[in-house]
């Protein structure tokens, strides 16, 4: 397991003392070769060679047992198997209280000491099973920065003075050489180090240091040490300088900003982790190509820009819903360009004193210039640089002005680029979005089917699974509006379910090692529990209503299938014939005739993203808020396309213009969204009303709500089917005559027929709470109390309206 340990670079000028903890002391030659600078924060990551660790709680006055790696010769002498785990006995020698306890351990087997000479010659490694905090070694090692030339073992001793709490360079070339670096005074007392912040336990380590084989292990520790960690490196080992981002230990904050508020130093990042590459990002190939042109071309070919006398772009704005991969794209670009990343997030850079925020911003930009190539990443820039209005404070206005000045000063910044991210691009001050500042804008939107398929394949590639290509295609087609983070959550939930199933199987099979895999059922379960983050604001609960739950209305069902399903399932036919799919459908008819339940069935049967909006919900007492709410609904629908927007009781939202100013503005906003400049693609508007005459006629012309479907009272067959559907849900006696009930309910709406069945059930319960079924007599009684809400005048009104409009069907 790789170990990443944080250090700060210091110059070896001969005056530094070993009391300075967690520093890497380098000669000027080493600094130049590794392209490092003093005070730069780096991570050292073990790369190759032998270095593992174990954890063992302190019991009494000793540490143990350890796991050791021994040679076959030593194993044969000790009657052990090679690489077998054995114990190390402890000999405790009390020293001065200030120095803690000195523990000198020797190897034993079956309580019989092994000759020290053999141990010196054949002991290969002392291992821990826990990723540790400290690395120390006696032999030369290679040290390199990603993308630069290694420092070989020959020049290591002369160029690296020491890595305190890390690597102690030796001039010898053999493991176990007792010759120390001439810069280290062995008689000098060992440095005291506080490693609380680096370790999960609460303890202090004065020093843990592997010295020469004559002592094998020498540890100076106080007795509060709960998890000692010892590392030994061989000549085959090497250290690599890595970025801190995502290489921190599990208990450390992974979202550390570039500016540390508690310190005057800026945290310099030596490029993002190598794990984040373009190959680890799915579905964003077009956006990655755009940002690579902006970042990599100027970094790799600055002379060409100078030759053509053009200024490369200095700022990029990535915008899109949360979880779409904006930050991941930035990290991948930085890794590929081998650039350091300086992260600014709004809350961490804002200071409470006058001028503190501006000073911090200037400091970060200065440090980025000093460590080129570099990327300044401003996350959630809308919080740091909102639009300057009367409501914005003076401090926020100053921060925006400072940011504008710094961006203007990027003209001669060299290999430095600013990348900003937000999910609210229209909330950013307009001055930031002009050429010369954040001049390039790239949308990281909700992925389409093809992008979702790439993301799902990528996520499942590292998970044992039994999902075939056809199932992957089906999964991608049913995850509309799922962003990358949502899909990752789906795979994670599915994997957790597979883990639980595996544990259960292991228990049932007497502890046999059974390892399962993610199956399609696991993904189906995960889909039902993970909602689309982009649609949570508008998403209604899954209606779970099917066409079979609606009696009759076959013509309406067919028209809706043509309007909603056909453009998705037969898109090529529409294109071949030059037919434009309808943009909107208006369902009108008497109350209770299944208009709303039909819309719910559309959502269930098609699996499209379904945004339900009730007319009164969009009205706001403040001018402009209602129109903004309309725009937000359509914006979400576009992002989550293919989708359906359902306006229930639309007559309350779009009354005839001229009667109410607020209604006029809402109608204008709707008209603009339906056939404005921005195309409405893969979004169907479905509306329902029982007062079609109240709707502004402009909404019902072709190209807007261009399909008007009358949903009238059910006929005889439809009423019979409704009663039959209720009979499947309720307990009807054999004497119940479905034909008679359908005949007696002529002129009733579907809702009234359902209410009749419910009333008959209540009558049966009233007669006998122990009743087993509902009889015909109960229906006869219920029919006596039946009230019909649909009048002849109402039917004539709808017939007259149908004649007055032109329906495209």
Swiss-Prot record:
Localization, UniProt: Cytoplasm
Main location: cytoplasm
GO cellular component: cytoplasm; cytosol
Record-linked InterPro entries: AAA+_ATPase (IPR003593), AAA_ATPase_domain (IPR050168), AAA_lid_3 (IPR041569), ATPase_AAA_core (IPR003959), ATPase_AAA_CS (IPR003960), P-loop_NTPase (IPR027417)
Pfam families for this protein: AAA, AAA_lid_3
A biological process term (GO) from this entry: ribosomal large subunit biogenesis
Ranges where the record places region Disordered: 169-199
Annotated positions binding ATP 2: 589-596
Gene3D superfamilies: 1.10.8.60, P-loop containing nucleotide triphosphate hydrolases (3.40.50.300)
Domain-level remarks: The first ATP-binding region binds ATP with low affinity whereas the second ATP-binding region binds ATP with high affinity.
Subunit-level organization: Homohexamer; ATP binding induces oligomerization. Forms a ring-shaped particle of about 12 nm diameter, that displays 6-fold radial symmetry. Associates with cytoplasmic pre-60S ribosomal particles.
Annotated protein name in UniProt: ATPase family gene 2 protein
Species annotation: Schizosaccharomyces pombe (strain 972 / ATCC 24843) (Fission yeast)
Gene that produces this protein: afg2
